[in-house]
A protein has these predicted regions:
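Surface-exposed, low-hydrophobicity segments enriched in Gly/Pro/acidic/Ser residues
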Residues: 1-634
Length: 634
């Protein structure tokens, strides 16, 4: 691991194992990375500590090859996918939290996959991470603004591991002179131990709460009465009763801004994130004593004044995958999987939805010769039952954006990816390559969630020229959607283009353009919803690359529009300057400097929504190594 991913615990970097190898397989004892069924419904990727067996048996007759893999281990971490809400002008640190809202977790080194606007980032180049604190900071290569989209997949440990994982897979390949068919079966189980309560120090009251919670959130009160202390290193709250519009009342915690009247109860309150639209409180900002949470009402927030209790889980999954190679480059096949996911082994409630299934059907043509050029085709259908639980993400990172879904419609990801509702997706991909320097990509798709959502998507990609010569690339997509639950219909147009013109001597000027127009309207009216932004961005730049030098500078102009009282109005203009210089003349010296500067002009009506008008981010690092490595500086 590079220094840009740090931890103060040396044991988190240790990999201790014993490996025994023969001609037909191997056995590994100790630490290992398990990657099984990658890209399938039953795929899993984990850092484990246990036994891994791999056997490759020679073929006989119609059997070309048989591969068997088996694993029995203790999970070193818990898988989690977290969406981070960016703050305008703040590069970090952003904290990764546990599935139960734990604010301090140990991220397993090397397990994180950080996505910014759907693109996978590189550690050190695009971000730095402290594994001991779970804090993530972005470099000036990417200026973080409120409209950016950040998603992180990682494994973490709370230091009290009780979870084990058993997995097995067999892959059979048939054919004589060439592969004609394949068959693959897999079975997996991940579960917490029976001494779960002792490990986490749960009280009798906690155990009762877990038993009564079913598959829902098990909580204990997050409020603790304390004496009033104006110098307390945490935010103090009082409690009051408020009347709601429907005539009911609610007990509300209100942050203190001054000394309360004598005798008024004062509380220290812990708030936990329970999910979008599932809480009553929102984060209102940072004070000297900590983060302040403000009451918004039932279903209007992401946080609750509670402590989330960890729940012991059991996750079983069996899968089958088969395919036939009709001709060289032609493959037809399918997958089937069935899962059992008990989110709370201590509770007999909510067991009716533990079992669920899923399947995929696909046809893939790698290359079909035409009179002009070659054609590649891929057709796929994927169906997921409600409550189907996978060991990893089954949809693209930007699945919500891909289909104009709300973030709260996505699968949950607290140790497993649990599908919230039944869903069927049909997609087709066609690529026509007229020559080595000309290609057209076409994508068609539809998504159905019976009684809740349906969407249609079309995308077009165009490539003219090669990277070493003048090249033009374009990608555009149009999404139409109808969300019955939200009572909204949408139309989302997105376009992106880039032109590069190499001039020689390592100089390459370029110009890129981005455009989006999202219109969300009520089902039976034409008025725009608040989440209907539009923007146009143009970014010219110049790249210079030499054997020891790499430089890139760009200046972007962006015009934005947002909805104000049902109408779309200009909401701001921004200028963004970004530059990067890397100089490495040899193995003994190297330096990198990065600059990001953004200036925004916002109309008064949108000033509260976009309070910052300037953002500046700088980063510089370097190293020196003397000959013979007698002296080293970083």
């Amino acid at each position: 691991l590079s220094p840009e991913g740090t931890t103060q615990r040396l044991r988190e970097f240790d990999r201790i194992y014993v490996r025994l190898q023969t001609r037909s397989g191997q056995v590994q004892l100790g630490d290992y990375d398990l990657k099984l069924g990658e890209g399938t419904l039953y795929g899993v990727q984990r850092k484990l500590q246990g036994v891994l067996l791999t056997a490759q048996l020679p073929g006989a007759g119609p059997v070309r090859r048989l591969t068997i893999r088996a694993s029995g281990a203790v999970s070193k971490g818990i898988y989690r996918r977290q969406t981070i809400v960016p703050v305008e002008g703040v590069q970090g640190p952003y904290r990764l939290t546990g599935a139960a809202g734990e604010p301090f977790v140990l991220v397993l080194p090397g397990t994180e996959r950080v996505y910014l606007d759907g693109q996978l980032l590189d550690r050190g180049t695009d971000y730095v991470i402290d594994y001991a604190t779970g804090e993530l900071t972005f470099t000036p290569r990417h200026l973080i603004t409120a409209e950016r989209r950040i998603s992180v997949e990682f494994e973490y440990t709370t230091g009290s591991g009780t979870r084990s994982l058993l997995a097995s897979q067999a892959h059979l390949e048939l054919g004589h002179s060439r592969p004609v068919a394949f068959l693959e079966v897999a079975a997996l189980r991940e579960a917490d131990g029976r001494r779960f309560g002792e490990t986490f120090g749960l009280t009798r009251a906690d155990s009762l709460a877990l038993r009564q919670a079913g598959d829902g959130l098990a909580v204990r009160s997050g409020a603790e009465q304390v004496p009033f202390d104006p110098e307390a290193p945490y935010v103090l709250y009082t409690r009051e009763v408020r009347a709601l519009p429907d005539g009911t009342t609610d007990t509300v915690y209100v942050a203190l801004t001054s000394a309360p009247p004598p005798g008024t109860p004062v509380y220290r309150v812990t708030f936990s994130r329970v999910g979008p639209g599932r809480g009553r409180y929102v984060r209102a900002g940072q004070t000297v004593n900590g983060i302040v949470y403000v009451y918004r009402g039932p279903g209007q927030g992401d946080y609750e004044p509670v402590r989330l209790l960890p729940t012991p889980v059991r996750h079983d999954l069996v899968g089958l995958r088969a395919g036939v190679h009709l001709w060289p480059g032609w493959t037809v096949g399918g997958e089937w999987a069935r899962s059992r996911y008990d989110a709370n082994r201590l509770s007999p409630l909510d067991a009716a939805d533990d079992l669920a299934g899923a399947y995929r059907l696909f046809l893939r043509i790698d290359s079909l010769t035409l009179s002009v050029g070659r054609l590649a085709v891929s057709l796929r259908r994927q169906h997921l039952d409600a409550h189907f639980a996978a060991f990893g993400r089954l949809q693209p990172v930007e699945f919500a954006r891909r289909w104009n879904l709300d973030v709260r419609d996505l699968a949950e990801s607290s140790g497993a990816s649990v599908q919230p509702v039944a869903e069927t997706a049909d997609e087709a991909y066609l690529t026509w390559r007229a020559s080595r320097s000309a290609a057209i990509d076409l994508e068609l798709g539809r998504l159905r969630r019976p009684g809740q959502f349906r969407g249609e998507r079309q995308a077009l990609g165009l490539t003219l020229g090669r990277e070493t010569t003048t090249q033009f690339r374009y990608h555009g997509e149009l999404i139409r959607s109808r969300h019955e639950v939200a009572g909204a219909r949408g139309r989302w147009l997105r376009q992106e283009g880039r032109l590069t013109v190499p001039l020689g001597a390592g100089l390459t000027p370029y110009i890129a353009a981005l455009h989006e127009d999202r219109r969300q309207q009520a089902l039976h009216t034409d008025s725009l919803h608040a989440d209907s932004p539009a923007y146009l961005e143009v970014r010219p730049g110049l790249a210079w690359q030499r054997p020891a030098l790499q430089a890139d500078v760009s200046l972007a102009w962006r015009r934005e529009a947002d909805v104000w009282q049902g109408r779309r109005l200009p909401s701001g203009r921004t200028w963004t300057l970004q530059g990067r210089l890397q100089y490495t003349p040899g193995p003994h010296f190297g330096t990198t400097a990065e600059l990001g500067y953004r200036r925004r002009r916002t109309p008064p009506r949108f000033a509260a929504r976009y309070p910052l008008d300037q953002t500046l981010a700088l980063h510089w690092d370097g190293f020196f190594r003397s000959p013979g490595r007698l002296l080293g500086l970083n």
